[in-house]
Amino acid sequence: MVDYNNFANKFAKSRKNMKWEEIDYFLEKIDKNNDLKILDIWCGSWRLLEQFSQNFNIDKIDYFWLDLSSEMLVVAKKNFPNKNFLNLNMLNVDKIKNKFNNIFFIASYHHLDNIEDREETLKKAYNLLEKWWRIFMTNWALNSEINNEKYNKALIKNSENKFKSTDYNIVFWENDRYYHCFDLSELEYLATKNNFRIIENRLFDSKRNFITILEK
């Protein structure tokens, strides 16, 4: 599992003022008139929370953010001191007893390095989600036309699984980071196995990330 403590401050600074089109797309699909209960799983830095604050009355949102990196949470707390933060591995998300009406995996789910953990994490997220509500997910499309040339050398040889998904080891700030590049069929399999209805599962318009929207 990726340890962001080694470069939390650098990562946060690199994401400062970065606006994700995918997040804006997700936020457009959320009803501002509802009492929002948000679970942010390993978003990193505070980009999702920041974009929420630009589009919603953040003081009225019950926002719960968990991250494996304690240093990343320290940075986030300085910017949003009144929100709920928990240092927790996403594999243990079932330790949270709250229920949520929107759960986000923004560039986080692709760090899980085996299908058993992917299945189990999604199952646990399903149990935390209120009926008829949604999970929003982005995963890095490392094999897309726009990404492939830059990251092809980081592809781990012979890592292709039965879905034709592949694994990458990418170095940032002298630290290795593992990424799973999903084939959309694997995401579809994981969703249906865990009883989700698939709203969207596709390469986003910018061609950099896959987006997946699932409904309980």
Name each model-derived stretch:
Residues R202-K216:
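Core SAM-dependent methyltransferase catalytic element
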